[in-house]
Curated annotation (Swiss-Prot):
<keyword id="KW-0067">ATP-binding</keyword>
<dbReference type="GO" id="GO:0008289">
    <property type="term" value="F:lipid binding"/>
</dbReference>
<dbReference type="InterPro" id="IPR038454">
    <property type="entry name" value="DnaA_N_sf"/>
</dbReference>
<protein>
    <recommendedName>
        <fullName>Chromosomal replication initiator protein DnaA</fullName>
    </recommendedName>
</protein>
<dbReference type="InterPro" id="IPR010921">
    <property type="entry name" value="Trp_repressor/repl_initiator"/>
</dbReference>
<feature type="region of interest" description="Domain I, interacts with DnaA modulators">
    <location>
        <begin position="1"/>
        <end position="73"/>
    </location>
</feature>
<keyword id="KW-0547">Nucleotide-binding</keyword>
<dbReference type="InterPro" id="IPR013159">
    <property type="entry name" value="DnaA_C"/>
</dbReference>
<dbReference type="Pfam" id="PF11638">
    <property type="entry name" value="DnaA_N"/>
</dbReference>
<dbReference type="Pfam" id="PF00308">
    <property type="entry name" value="Bac_DnaA"/>
</dbReference>
<dbReference type="InterPro" id="IPR003593">
    <property type="entry name" value="AAA+_ATPase"/>
</dbReference>
<dbReference type="GO" id="GO:0005737">
    <property type="term" value="C:cytoplasm"/>
</dbReference>
<feature type="binding site">
    <location>
        <position position="161"/>
    </location>
    <ligand>
        <name>ATP</name>
    </ligand>
</feature>
<dbReference type="GO" id="GO:0016887">
    <property type="term" value="F:ATP hydrolysis activity"/>
</dbReference>
<dbReference type="GO" id="GO:0003688">
    <property type="term" value="F:DNA replication origin binding"/>
</dbReference>
<keyword id="KW-0963">Cytoplasm</keyword>
<dbReference type="InterPro" id="IPR001957">
    <property type="entry name" value="Chromosome_initiator_DnaA"/>
</dbReference>
């Protein structure tokens, strides 16, 4: 039986969504389209050259294997740029390669770096790349090489201590290596607001505007703190427009995407979203170990592997805590004179409580009890609105609080298909962003589930 292009691509998307992380799927796969299917060739089109190069470099083999599995015979995967973008010239950088320039610490143009408020340690060569940050790292390299062209603005979002500031400042260092006379400006949103207030008090708005709009690359940290500040938003809107229209690069960092920043003017939200939004997730175990190893190398510290594994396994939420634990361990060993091993450092580290992996039964019981629904109904096929919604919430919570795959979650709910689980998780995730009551209910259920699963 011949498979149509639409059917094939739908099946490919379903399988890739199971294999890849959600940020990867949403950013690189979901934005692509299958355009043509011949006997031995599938043509896939991407929205821009960066996406094309990224798919070609990292995911073409995965796509080829999935298509082969569906069709029953091998096909060539050809990735092209969608019509209208064929003249674009930016290509993806080598992600794992540091910039081919001298270390900023050893460079002589110190005054420019000080004026730009750049930390000498925040360079690309000291940034550890893993699955959690590969897209953001590659996008920052692309911006550093060709500012104001492909991703403008570039919006980095991720939790506290995940490396957003490091990447932003690495862009500044890179530009100053290539072009020492570049005007690089790294600021926090708080600094922008304080400077604006001072300018208003001193009748210095003209000087303020000249200062902030005469830059080549503007790097703005913690942009989420602009929320609710109407006059700051007004001034930043015009500053952003002036820079963007002049082809100057703007890079923004936040702990959440633009659409989730409360009391943000719609026009600013639109502008923040019109470039690339690159998400940074907490690092996995291997990346955390690599971060510790690199930190130890730069500080000329010898660490046994078991110590690296212990610290990396104990601190999972962010890089600042991870590096802070390493510093405490090294300081204690240095002062005490004891050998560096897990037994000696464990008492002084006091790692945070490990994330509790919940049992599926505890989640089902909590949801059934909260919504007054029997477990049989929750696992059944009833389409009654209140039962269906509770079932979707249960699937979402099981996705959040267990390591079960989508098919396994489906089995826990009476043998539901993995696509049903996928739809349910996406629906609840979207609804909670618009419904504060649902978000609060999910938090309370999450706390209840954690309490029920404590040892």
């Amino acid at each position: 039986m011949e498979t149509s292009l639409e059917t094939l691509w739908s099946q490919v998307l379903e399988r890739l969504q199971l294999q890849l992380s959600r940020p990867t799927f949403e950013t690189w796969i979901k934005t692509a389209n299958a355009e043509q299917l011949d006997e031995n060739r599938l043509v896939i089109r991407t929205p821009n050259p960066f996406a094309r190069n990224w798919l070609q470099k990292y995911y073409v083999k995965t796509i080829r294997d999935v298509v082969h599995e569906i069709l029953g015979h091998p096909v060539e995967i050809q990735i092209e740029i969608a019509q209208g973008d064929s003249n674009a010239t930016i290509s993806a950088p080598e992600v794992a390669s540091p910039p081919p320039t001298a270390s900023p610490v050893e460079n002589t143009n110190t005054s420019q770096r000080q004026q730009a408020s750049l930390n000498p340690k925040y360079v690309f060569s000291r940034y550890v790349v893993g699955p959690n940050n590969r897209m953001a790292h590659a996008a920052c390299l692309a911006v550093a090489e060709s500012p104001g062209r492909e991703f403008n603005p570039l919006f980095l979002c991720g939790g506290v201590g995940l490396g957003k500031t490091h990447l932003m400042q690495a862009i500044g260092h890179y530009r100053l290596e290539i072009s020492p006379n570049s005007r690089i400006f790294y600021i926090s949103t708080e600094q922008f607001t304080n400077d604006l207030i001072a300018a208003i008090r001193k009748d210095g708005m003209q000087k303020f505007r000249e200062h902030y709009r005469a830059v080549d690359v503007m790097l703005v940290d913690d942009i989420q703190f602009i929320e609710g500040k109407e006059y700051t938003q007004e001034e930043f809107f015009h500053t952003f427009n002036t820079l963007h229209e002049a082809g100057k690069q703007v890079v923004l960092a936040s702990d959440r995407p633009p659409s989730q920043i409360p009391r943000l003017q719609e026009r600013l939200c639109s502008r923040f979203s019109m470039g690339l939004i690159a998400d940074i997730q907490p690092p996995d175990l291997e990346t955390r170990m690599a971060i510790l190893q690199k930190k130890a190398e730069y500080e000329n510290i010898r660490l046994p592997r078991e110590v690296i594994e212990y610290i990396a396994s104990s601190y999972t939420s962010n890089i600042r805590e991870l590096e802070g634990a390493l510093i405490r361990a090294v300081a204690y060993i240095s002062i005490s004179g004891l050998p560096m091993n897990v037994e000696n450092i464990a008492p002084v580290l006091n790692p945070p409580t490990a994330k509790i992996s919940a049992s599926p039964e505890s989640i089902i019981n909590a949801v059934a009890d909260t919504y007054g629904i029997s477990i049989d109904d929750l696992k059944g096929n009833s389409r009654r609105r209140e039962i269906s919604m509770a079932r979707q919430i249960g699937m979402y919570l099981m996705r959040q609080h267990t390591d079960l795959s989508l098919p396994k979650i489906g089995e826990e709910f009476g043998g539901k298909d993995h696509t049903t689980v996928m739809y349910s998780c996406d629906k609840v995730s979207d609804l909670q962003k618009k419904n504060p009551e649902l978000a609060q209910s999910l938090r309370q259920l999450g706390d209840r589930i954690k309490l029920a699963n404590q040892p």
